[in-house]
Design a protein with these regions (language model features):
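Basic polycationic patches enriched in arginine
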Residues: 470, 476-477
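Compositionally biased, intrinsically disordered low-complexity regions used as flexible
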Residues: 79, 466-469
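Soluble, non-transmembrane alpha-helical interaction regions
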Residues: 466, 479-481
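Alpha-helical transmembrane-bundle signature of multi-pass membrane transport and export proteins
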Residues: 1-449, 454-455, 460, 479
């Protein structure tokens, strides 16, 4: 029997503890990095906003370029060793930047400092692309059953949201009182704690997966190149209607959330009449809603199932976002933002067991490596599109429908809510309830038996056999998880 203080199991508890410490360290690091760039490296410069945005661009490039191919290697490698190796790499990178930052700011040109910052962020995010699918796969091995997997996802979500609330308030005092170096060293130390926690997790050694997932496991894994394994992962994903459905409504929903993330600062100050100094309360409201949703998610999934939870959460959150777009007061807006984040976090939690069960063990790394870059790309496109619409095409928009007035920002956010509603309607049809649909196979739902959900390999491969919608949190600038 597991100890009373365990979360699901002792091994999962140790894995969670490492994530908790590392997440707080990431938030401290990301907030510190933004403060350092904005107030020191680019202080009083006209290009300061561009310098700050470069941090986001560096992280996004790593996700889009490294993310898809990382899953191939994760499926090949030992998952626990992969996680340990990435923690060593990330801790070393942050520690190295911390040591260099002991130099006076004027010791190096601003361009050199920014190159060091962007390079570090890019490498941290690149390493995280290996860490995330490896952790995803280990959780699948440690936690079984839809309810427990949903509970594990809920705990993970709650931990991330808590770090979002705790990290930034820690970062500012560290930065302004002790300096950027000590805030960075705090993050490096968090990677060390995570390394120790992960090294104590006991994971049964897995058999090396064949490159094409055919299950024969002979020598083709050595003959197959990375590209072939990557294509095999894409083929597996594309032949699973269930996985494609998950990706489609995740991307549609991400368009809605991405627009909110981009324009929320303008909505709260212009439509809600809130002072920019109070914008921190928006992040706190999102964090509170995320924690409540994460804590409720496991029970909700247990009651109505992961599939029904997914499409219901999309419909509810979409309707709440439309309602949020009509608010004109600070209190009402904050309350609706909390309520909106709750079902969205429940949605993220419900999707975890669906992904875990839909992907065969040898493809889990590649499934995650397809999912994350696509949703990241959707978020980037949504941010660019919504910003362009608000600043150009709809800048002077002023209309009314049935006595309700619409301006540019609230109109875009309302359309974003409709996108999430559309995603929910699509999910309702694409993810039928288990009692009304038979799962299995590449065109069905999650694999319930060995080989379910795997695509039939082409003849030449059989002859020679050889891989989530984010809560509207303030951008984790520089975060690597």
């Amino acid at each position: 029997m597991a100890p009373r203080l365990s979360l699901i199991s002792p091994d999962f508890t140790r894995l969670w503890f490492g994530q908790a410490v590392s997440s707080v360290g990431d938030m401290v690091f990301s907030t510190t990095l933004m403060l350092w760039v904005a107030t020191v490296l680019a202080k009083n410069e006209s290009w300061a906003p561009a310098a700050v945005s470069g941090v986001l661009v560096a992280g996004g490039i790593a996700v889009l370029v490294v993310g898809p191919i990382a899953g191939v290697f994760v499926d090949r490698w030992d998952k626990r060793r992969t996680m340990l190796g990435t923690e060593v790499l990330r801790g070393g990178l942050v520690a190295l930047l911390a040591v260099v930052s002991f130099l006076p700011a004027d010791a190096l040109p601003a361009g050199v400092w920014l190159t060091l910052v962007y390079g570090t962020v890019l490498l941290l995010h690149a390493a995280a692309r290996f860490f995330a699918p490896a952790r995803f796969t280990i959780i699948a091995d440690l936690v079984t059953g839809e309810a427990d997997r949903a509970r594990a996802a809920g705990i993970t979500q709650a931990t991330s949201q808590t770090a979002l609330i705790v990290g930034p308030p820690l970062a500012a005092p560290l930065f302004f009182t002790l300096g950027v170096q000590w805030a960075m060293l705090f993050n490096a130390l968090s990677y060390l704690v995570s390394y120790v926690a992960i090294s104590s997790v006991r994971v049964a050694p897995a058999e090396k997966a064949p490159a094409d997932g055919s299950g024969t496991g002979k020598t083709a894994g050595h003959r197959s190149g990375v590209l072939r394994e990557f294509v095999a992962g894409l083929r597996f994903f594309g032949r699973s209607r269930f996985l494609v459905a998950l990706l489609v409504f995740a991307v549609i929903g991400q368009f809605g959330v991405g627009a909110l993330n981009t324009l929320n600062i303008f909505f709260t100050t212009e439509n809600l009449g809130m002072s920019a100094k109070l914008f921190g309360y928006v992040g706190m409201a999102i964090g509170v809603g995320g924690i409540v949703g994460a804590l409720c998610a496991g029970r909700v999934v247990q009651w109505i199932g992961a599939r029904r939870t997914t499409w219901v959460s999309l419909l509810v959150s979409g309707a709440l976002l439309v309602a949020y777009s009509r608010q004109t007061g600070f209190v009402g807006g904050i309350i609706l933002l909390v309520l909106f984040t709750i079902p969205l976090t429940v949605l993220n939690t419900a999707m975890a067991p669906l992904l875990l069960s839909a992907a065969s063990a040898e493809y889990r790394g590649r499934v995650v490596a397809v999912f994350q870059p696509m949703t990241q790309l959707a978020a980037m496109v949504a941010a660019a599109l919504s910003g362009w619409l608000a600043g150009t095409l709809l800048r002077d928009f002023d209309g009314s429908v049935a006595g309700l007035r619409f301006g540019p920002i609230d109109t875009i956010i309302a359309v974003a809510g409709l996108c999430i509603l559309l995603s929910g309607l699509y999910a309702r049809g694409a993810l039928p309830d288990p009692e009304t649909s038979e799962d299995g196979g590449p065109t069905g739902g999650p694999a319930g038996e060995e080989g379910a959900g795997e695509p039939a390999a082409p003849a030449e491969e059989t002859a020679a056999p050889a891989a989530a919608v984010r809560s509207p949190a303030p951008p984790r600038r520089g975060s690597t998880e």
